Amino acid sequence: MSLFRAGAIAVLLLVTFLSACGEDSTSTPVQTFSERLEESFTVGDLSDLMVSNFAGTVVVRQGSAGVINVVAIKRAAREEDLDQFDVQMVALQNGVEVSTTNSLQLTQVSVDFEITAPLDVQPLIQVAAGSIDYEGSGIGQNSFTTAAGSVTVRLPADVNVEVLLTVGAGTISIGFPVVGLVEDQRIDGIIGTGVDGRIEASVAAGEIVVSPR
């Protein structure tokens, strides 16, 4: 089943994520124990970065040309739970696929990713409950999805891309002039000439922010 579905499932995921942080939404997450994993991959131009995460944050920043470096921080309320959910990092023909699984449906567990990648990497990032913070060029295909959380995309000030941004319950903020459809919960148009790439971001419950870096 896909990590992302709109409507009722998104709301359920949001409630589940908040309850994993404590008994109510104002509680501080009790994820005392952590485990750090790190791996580097050699890639070419316009490499692919595919990430799917059941809960947590995904942060992507510009790194060295030809290298994708992935740091995963597993977090859990109980030390014994750290071995009960998995992180996979697999080299593709020209890129990296990173995924997490929580087959036991544990609560109070998550994985935070800190990734550095070439500026021209093409991301496909999906998070069930959590946030995505991406900084890149916007070249090629760029896709970001979360059911409950936020998507932040930082692009060059002179970027030329198509954009399709949709939010089910929440807000969209964009720091570029857009030619096309601009509504509170949907933006479908172009920034600049739109010839260099495409940005797609979808959030069921939360916010989308697209801004110059």
Regions found by a protein language model. Give the residues of each.
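Hydrophobic residues embedded in beta-strands of well-ordered beta-sheets
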Residues: 68, 94-96, 172, 208
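Mid-chain, structured segments of secreted extracytoplasmic proteins
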Residues: 76-105
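Sec-dependent bacterial lipoprotein signal peptides
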Residues: 1-19
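Short, T/G/N/S-enriched strand-turn elements that build extracellular solenoid repeat scaffolds
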Residues: 38-40, 57-62, 87-88, 112-116, ...
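Repetitive beta-strand solenoid architecture
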Residues: 37, 45, 54, 64, ...
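Short, surface-exposed interaction patches in beta-rich subdomains
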Residues: 135-146, 150-213
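Short acidic/polar N-terminal linker immediately downstream of export determinants
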Residues: 21-67, 75-80, 103-110, 177-196
